[in-house]
Amino acid sequence: MNFEIKDTNIRKIFDSRGNFSAEVTVILENASGTASAPAGASTGKTEVIAYPDNNIDNGIDFFYRHVKKALKGFNSINQEGLDRMLHEIDGTDNFSNLGGNIATAISIANAKAVSNALGIPMYRYVGGINYSMPRPIGNVIGGGKHSKNGTTIQEFLVSAQGKTVLDSIYYNILIHRRIGEILSGMFKNQSIGLGDEKAWTCDISDEDAIEIIKNASKDISSEYKIKVLNGVDFAADSFYDGNYYIYKNRKLTRDQQIDYAISISRDHGFYYIEDPLNDQDFDGFSEITSKVGDKSLIVGDDLYTTNPERIKKGIEKRSTNGVLIKVNQIGTLSDTARSVRIATEHGLKTVVSHRSGETTDDFIAHLAVAFGSPLIKTGTIGGERLAKLNELIRIEEELI
């Protein structure tokens, strides 16, 4: 079987916010693969550069001048070699010439092309025999950089633990609906809206949101006799001014923010706590994990940015017991797989995640299964979110 790359095409498409995204098609002799990259609103300082000078056209121009010809004839089954070549052609340590989003689209499209050529699903090609089904965790109340006039905390999340992925998705949707009913009752003469990730957003406090999500989860849990895990993504770096954590109605010192994050676990029983501190405070994360890591999953996103070296630092300091995984934070499938391998070898749980500006590409569903991640973070409703969730349903059907 011939795995040489015959051609590679790139085009501009639109993401869920109406912004441009890069989509790439890798063409082999008897198969092809197409992938597109999402975009984040709350981005970590150590992520690779999405597009050079924040301009997708500059990245596309670099692709045509330097990458397209180099890919032709390359053995596509050598994923690590292809990803290494992308780094070499770019010539920087953060993809500032090609753009990490374009590198991501090329890397994933290549893996899809090989999977299609072999006649196997992508999760099996990437994960081999080591795969398992994750449970979805989705945003139901949103704030921060995902909405205007919402909560300071960026995401309030639920993960219903149904017998199947289908059940879990359905129960998450029911909780989302229940929260909409609660908010409609609270704001009878005001409209409520949906944020970037289709979570409810309105002018409420973080404390109100905590109580609403607890009540909605309890309602669905009691009615359907299921367990529901609640969570938050603080995205704390986005409201940290260098000295204080600035909420709508107060500002907290570092120690007060640590205590608040701990109370989310101890006092409210939340299982999932992401980015409770700024993205340089490895020691502060360690303090939170040492106090409540036995009952809650403390997850680093901006702290790690899917970067193997930062994950190693977190392991050394025992900063978290969970790592968020986003391919376009690091730029290639091989780099992502390395980060996952380092994390899992040291007992950290991985959570494969979408971005707020998503496309309908479903590749993260396959990666979550391939990496054996216990959770996949990809919303509850919205076409670009359900594209991933529906693909999980199809994958589970294959595996049952």
Curated annotation (Swiss-Prot):
Needed co-factor(s): Mg(2+)
Protein keywords: Cytoplasm, Glycolysis, Lyase, Magnesium, Metal-binding, Secreted
GO MF, one annotated term: phosphopyruvate hydratase activity
Gene Ontology CC, one term: extracellular region
One Pfam match: Enolase_N
PROSITE patterns, alphabetized: ENOLASE (PS00164)
Subcellular location: Cytoplasm; Secreted; Cell surface
Active site residues of this protein: 197, 326
CDD domains xref list: enolase
Cofactor comment text: Binds a second Mg(2+) ion via substrate during catalysis.
Chain positions recorded as Mg(2+) binding sites: 233, 274, 301
GO biological process: glycolytic process
Name recorded for this polypeptide: Enolase
